[in-house]
Amino acid sequence: MAHPHLLAERISRLSCALEKGLYERSHAIRLCLLAALSGESVFLLGPPGIAKSLIARRLKFAFQRARAFEYLMTRFSTPEEVFGPLSIQALKDEGRYERLTTGYLPEAEIVFLDEIWKAGPAILNTLLTAINERHFRNGAFEEKIPMRLLVAASNELPEADSSLEALYDRMLIRLWLDKVQDKANFRSMLVSQQDESDNPVPASLQVSDEEYQQWQKDIGAISLPDPVFELIFTLRQQLDNLPNAPYVSDRRWKKAIRLLQASAFFSGRDAVAPIDLILLKDCLWYDAQSLNLMQQQLEILMTGHAWQQQAMLTRLGGIVQRRLQLQQQQSDKTAFTVIKEGGMFSRRPHYTLPPEASASTLTLLLQKPLKLHDMEVIHITFDRSALELWLTKGGEIRGKLNGIGFAQTLNMEVDNAQHLVVRDISLQGTRLALPGAAEDSMPAEIKQQLETLENDWRQQHTRFSEQQHCLFIHSDWLGRIEASLQDVGEQIRQAQQC
């Protein structure tokens, strides 16, 4: 077997070749290629004339000697037009009911059925067996069919509670396409002279029958790690608890997991990674409402849980809370304490300065910086006599902010523990302390916990960096996940600097 990274590079080059000349269809081509390489089915929803059939035709060129069949369904379509006409000779000579399948669906590797919901019951029932079992009953015999990819298309969804739901459930990947939006792409499409029937894929990139068969075995060997399963189960529980969530059958979940295994395999990995789960957004929706719902739920999962983002923020919150507790304990020890000397008949208590505050001017440190008079303040200088007068009689108290300029009025009080507390305009307060008494260093316990958390964050970010090279995931998702991880990292760094 080819080296995993060489295989991933080859599939990437194959996809690029298939995408050539198709504008704003890269994601659709890549997911259809993934479906073809893993033997799954795709439903394309969108208005007429947006290259749905061309996407299917292109996928034929991914394989060596692949045969294609396409058909536009109508209400009057018959099984003979899809599965082949009856053999008059066999019926006449031998009385056998047998179809001539050459050139029809039973002998095609790539199948495109347009306006699929207009098919009648006879076609739908046979098609269900073909998709489920890859078998076709031709008269008295069961014939194995080589179909690797079924692409069904329509400009509408099947009606709810109709006989079409069984077939719709078999279409694992569902893509909602629209017209070309970008101006430059629209112009390029208009002036393109590329022949749609040309094969854009070099022979060296095309997949042989032997490779395809071997890859089916290799895909099944890709492991599903426990942490990834837990994410999938979390998503399943979230959907089960939402009132408007689509019903997802166990069969659909199982087929979706195989698609995730294929994504991992063709990305050069031996195990499903959280990044692969983004593919579920194209597998689990039913209509426009559930499509938006799946996008929202997967974004919550990817940006909050897949790389432990929310768990790390919860841990950080606990560390910060513990730090505040330790700071409060330290604050009680280092805060500047005055002496209460209120008499028995005094209307209000009055205080005196402690013996260590004997200088004519006192500089007291804020245990936490505050913004006072539009200035970030870390210490205040008081005239000792003015401070003594305020402690005895109350009234206005002034101090020089950071020891400079004129003395400014302060909102200051003595709390129940006999500590001086200064408050800003929003009434947030901090205690004052003598220089040398305040402990500025971070407690060793907190420092160690933050370092451990930062190391865990680096490991998660490294995991994401190693896994993000996935051809089948749109770059927009990678940007959102990276932003969520960077936000967690920034909050950790801010906590370390406080």
From Swiss-Prot:
Tell where it localizes: Cytoplasm
Q: Molecular function (GO) terms listed?
A: ATP binding; ATP hydrolysis activity
Task: List keywords of the entry alphabetically.
Answer: ATP-binding, Chaperone, Cytoplasm, Hydrolase, Nucleotide-binding
What would be one Gene Ontology cellular-component term for the protein? cytoplasm
Annotated ADP binding sites: 23, 49-54, 196
Its catalytic activity?
A: ATP + H2O = ADP + phosphate + H(+)
Superkingdom to which the source organism belongs: Bacteria
Chain ranges passing through the membrane = none
Q: How is its activity regulated?
A: ATPase activity is stimulated by ViaA.
Q: What is its EC number?
A: 3.6.1.-
Family stated for the protein in its record: Belongs to the RavA family.
Assembly mode: Homohexamer. Interacts with ViaA.
Quote the function comment for this protein: Component of the RavA-ViaA chaperone complex, which may act on the membrane to optimize the function of some of the respiratory chains. RavA functions as an ATPase.
Q: Which NCBIfam families match?
A: PRK13531.1
Return the protein name.
Regulatory ATPase RavA
**Species this chain originates from:** Salmonella gallinarum (strain 287/91 / NCTC 13346)
From the broadest rank down, the organism's phylogenetic lineage runs:
Bacteria, Pseudomonadati, Pseudomonadota, Gammaproteobacteria, Enterobacterales
